[in-house]
């Protein structure tokens, strides 16, 4: 197995604001606050309202251009709408990693035996979308999702596993709770610990705590894990044949945080910098196969109200778009 370079990921939740106000938007503002249970001090209200309006204008412009055929995806207001782009990006780390090297001829050759579509949700491998909240626990959600899928493959039972167990107990492997971590370090913890609890016995709190693992409650274990080389070809083969795979991407753009549908392609996305962990649960294409509108199907951890019920279609076979293949891994269970 060729080792890949694996780097710490800083994940992110929700942040704070800036200024402006259009009285015609008062009702929409109140509805948005109610929907996302937002409340502010009088001073903060003015700042948040201004940021919210700026984000609304940006999203409306994007969707108008999308209607004219300029973009391939839509955006919408969501829980991040009172947050500036700068605030959002401050929660991320800028870590350089080697670019993925793609060999088109090899990819075409290997792809002959692979299905055109894969969606592990339809085969029972994927648990419902959860919400990490303000804790930077994306890495733990991505790791847990991959283990859940492999446990289902082995046992036929799909059990939501404990993200909190990883947050509290995998610091010895280099993870740092709500601050940062990687899926492969989480896998290493489970391997050494010889077990991971279920969500039912070790529920998510969204904050760091002392390790409270009880071996008698272990619901999953792994026998090893694989770090994939940073190349979409390897990711393609793994997702087609193994199951859901943990990955990391550049999620620092406004277009990502407000994504709502379509195949996401952000021209400014980096293939060298990753800052948010996700679970790749499938792939496919929109339109005709020859259109080249291929996508990876990823599961996020921002709740079902983000994206396509918590999922995203992100461009596939586009030079490792957003670094999707740069830090991919999956557990072994024999």
UniProtKB/Swiss-Prot annotation:
Signal peptide: 1-17
Gene Ontology, cellular component aspect: extracellular space; lysosome; perinuclear region of cytoplasm
Record-listed E.C. numbers: 3.4.22.-
InterPro entries reported for this sequence: Papain-like_cys_pep_sf (IPR038765), Pept_asp_AS (IPR025661), Pept_cys_AS (IPR000169), Pept_his_AS (IPR025660), Peptidase_C1A (IPR013128), Peptidase_C1A_C (IPR000668), Peptidase_C1A_papain-like (IPR039417), Prot_inhib_I29 (IPR013201)
Tissue specificity statement from the Swiss-Prot or TrEMBL entry: Expressed specifically in placenta.
SUPFAM superfamilies: Cysteine proteinases
Main localization (coarse): other
Residue numbers covered by the propeptide annotation in the UniProt entry: 18-113
PANTHER family: CYSTEINE PROTEASE FAMILY C1-RELATED (PTHR12411)
Family membership: Belongs to the peptidase C1 family.
Protein name: Cathepsin J
Organism this protein belongs to: Rattus norvegicus (Rat)
